[in-house]
Amino acid sequence: LGLHGPIDIQYALMVSCNYFFYEAGNRQGIDNISKYSEQLGLGSKTGIELSENTGHISNPQTFRDLRGENSEEQWTLGNVLQSAIGQLDNAFTPLQMANYVATLANDGTRMRSHLVKSVESYNLEETVSTTQPEVLNQVEASKEAFEQVREGMVRCSRDTTRGSARYYFGDYPIDVAAKTGTPQASGGELDATFIAYAPAYDPEIAVAVVVENGYSGQRGAPIARAIFDEYFGLNKEQEQQQPQTEGQLIP
């Protein structure tokens, strides 16, 4: 299959093989691609407490809506293949992508996004209100399917020879499930996208990074790593415990 030869889903995710997903898209068809994209929250509102742009999923209806009913352009099989790798008319917000990767981490349970977890009283002695978790929908896919995707994303960060995020997470102290992306933008420029969640086998945090004109999906990896470092407290310098001498000020 192209440069990589016969491969499975895990390897395809690890090395970001477009040819694999061209073939997968061809076999699934645009209706299935659209169905699962929508169930995963792409092109849909996240439920955040602000107005938001829903973006859109690449499919024949979006194709006609964007070009007009009188356009001479026709939907073709090539459009299906481009849609399958996130190109053509796919347009998603960073929050949608963060919600999407969180849904992968939750084995298909998509939660509503919120800005505030809780509100505390002015003296921090009382919790005034707490935002309750809300399930938006469940993706119609098996647990095994999500496990395969997770393992491919872990290999993306952990495999020290071929993983597309290996330079930033190959030796990271916490297992990270990650995926790089390099969508083509207008004018021939390439944006960089990076989605990830951690710990891979007991998820707590999901991250989406977009770097406009970033050229390679790897450009988002160090930003995601900095976020994980802060969240997991890995960026704190280890304080050296030195014996205190008489008259020494305590810092």
Regions found by a protein language model. Give the residues of each.
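Beta-lactam-recognizing serine transpeptidase/beta-lactamase-like catalytic domain environment
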Residues: 1-208, 247-251
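Periplasmic/cell-envelope proteins involved in peptidoglycan metabolism and beta-lactam response
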Residues: 31-39, 178, 210, 218-251
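Short, conserved micro-motifs enriched in small and acidic residues
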Residues: 88-95, 214-222
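Intrinsically disordered, low-complexity acidic/polar segments
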Residues: 185, 204, 216-218, 234
